[in-house]
Amino acid sequence: MNAPFEKDRRNRRVAVVVVAAGRGERAGQAQNGPKQYRLIGGKPVIRHTLEVLAKSKRVGTIAVAVHPEDSSLFNQAREGLDGDIRAVHGGASRQESTRLALAALEEVKPDIVLIHDGVRPFIDEALIERVIEAVGEDSGALPALPVSDTLKRSGVNGIITGTVPRDGLFAAQTPQGFPFRPIYEAHQKAWQSGRSDFTDDAAIAEWAGISVRLVSGSPDNVKLTWAKDIALADQRLGPAMTELPDIRVGNGYDVHGFGPGGHVTLCGVQIPHGKTLMGHSDADVGLHALTDALLATCGAGDIGTHFPPSDPQWKGAKSRIFVEHAVNLLRARGGRIANADVTLICEAPRIGPYREAMLAELSDMLQISPERVSVKATTNEGLGFIGRAEGIAAIATATVAYPGSLGN
């Protein structure tokens, strides 16, 4: 037995591989996207999984195997989470994705690695602890539950050919834990041998001669495989949003002065005018104020934090980009926009003829119904720089509901 490995079990370095590169065909991926990014309880499935792992005091680096086409979805889902969470491009199979994520952890040199399905969001700290404590120098551990259903063997045309005894049968779960070096080498050996038919990491360990110990699993630790699984998970988490919703209101303000030009852009609509607004991007004061209001609801700073005026890539950019970025951030946190209100303050141009077009633009950007959006206009009664027609100001308010209660 390796003494350093065992002498202080509480100080062993633990890393996690989260496998989340699948396409989710069985859960209706074609219509609704990969299941790990489907919303349950107002947040992506993978977000729930990562929140539990990131909060664990035993877990260090988390390497998440992500499909290359899902990088943006993953970044939105993990936004705001603390800890060393790394995205790794996955492969064509679960086994290949796991091997690539393990390779990414080589530089971390963990003592133990937990390998977990990204679509098992209902893990808990106690389960993580049981698996870690059961891992030895040269042996792994996996959570499992005794098989309780009667098992039948089927033959041709679905005719039962026998009943399988349940004695000694267990349904495996994740996270499955292993000493890092042995399981990584086992994955490498399987890859080099052309073996890609293993259904979990414990099977690879067994094939490589690594013993694996069973620990008590959790009935709650279900894998979301089918569309109905996701619907049931959403129902399970739904009350957190409906019983004591966390309602947040954010405000935003922006102002830009006029310069030479022939039009202004307000709330995404181009309006003919004898001057243009000068400033960041297309200087859409309405959308800039709205972006700040949305960011305020999730404590994500302001527009300048995400899109610095000094960065030349945003020169002349459409401000719609900023609003959609803020919407993605709050939705990654489970936010649902209830209302957005923009007040434009100017002597000219007239806003009334363009109000309906503005409402349609905002509704599309925010992905909410037009009834939840408001655009108003007022003058400054001839007072100040606005009254002198030197510029336009905007005030915006956003109301967003987040999962959980005010106590969270």
From Swiss-Prot:
GO biological process, one term: terpenoid biosynthetic process
Binding site for 4-CDP-2-C-methyl-D-erythritol 2-phosphate: 254-256, 280-281, 302-304, 378-381, 385, 388
Chain residue ranges for the region called 2-C-methyl-D-erythritol 4-phosphate cytidylyltransferase: 1-247
Residues that bind a divalent metal cation: 254, 256, 288
2-C-methyl-D-erythritol 2,4-cyclodiphosphate synthase as annotated region, ranges: 248-408
Annotated site (Positions MEP for the nucleophilic attack): 166, 223
An annotated Gene Ontology molecular function: metal ion binding
Pathway: Isoprenoid biosynthesis; isopentenyl diphosphate biosynthesis via DXP pathway; isopentenyl diphosphate from 1-deoxy-D-xylulose 5-phosphate: step 2/6; Isoprenoid biosynthesis; isopentenyl diphosphate biosynthesis via DXP pathway; isopentenyl diphosphate from 1-deoxy-D-xylulose 5-phosphate: step 4/6
E.C. designation(s): 2.7.7.60, 4.6.1.12
Superkingdom of the organism of origin: Bacteria
SUPFAM superfamilies, per database record: IpsF-like, Nucleotide-diphospho-sugar transferases
Name used for this protein in its record: Bifunctional enzyme IspD/IspF
Catalytic activity: 2-C-methyl-D-erythritol 4-phosphate + CTP + H(+) = 4-CDP-2-C-methyl-D-erythritol + diphosphate; 4-CDP-2-C-methyl-D-erythritol 2-phosphate = 2-C-methyl-D-erythritol 2,4-cyclic diphosphate + CMP
Alphabetical keyword list: Isoprene biosynthesis, Lyase, Metal-binding, Multifunctional enzyme, Nucleotidyltransferase, Transferase
PANTHER family referenced in this protein's UniProt entry, alphabetically: 2-C-METHYL-D-ERYTHRITOL 2,4-CYCLODIPHOSPHATE SYNTHASE, CHLOROPLASTIC (PTHR43181:SF1)
Membership in a protein family: In the N-terminal section; belongs to the IspD/TarI cytidylyltransferase family. IspD subfamily. In the C-terminal section; belongs to the IspF family.
Cofactor entry: a divalent metal cation
Keyword presence, Nucleotidyltransferase: yes
UniProt site positions, description: Transition state stabilizer: 26, 35, 280, 379
Reported function: Bifunctional enzyme that catalyzes the formation of 4-diphosphocytidyl-2-C-methyl-D-erythritol from CTP and 2-C-methyl-D-erythritol 4-phosphate (MEP) (IspD), and catalyzes the conversion of 4-diphosphocytidyl-2-C-methyl-D-erythritol 2-phosphate (CDP-ME2P) to 2-C-methyl-D-erythritol 2,4-cyclodiphosphate (ME-CPP) with a corresponding release of cytidine 5-monophosphate (CMP) (IspF).
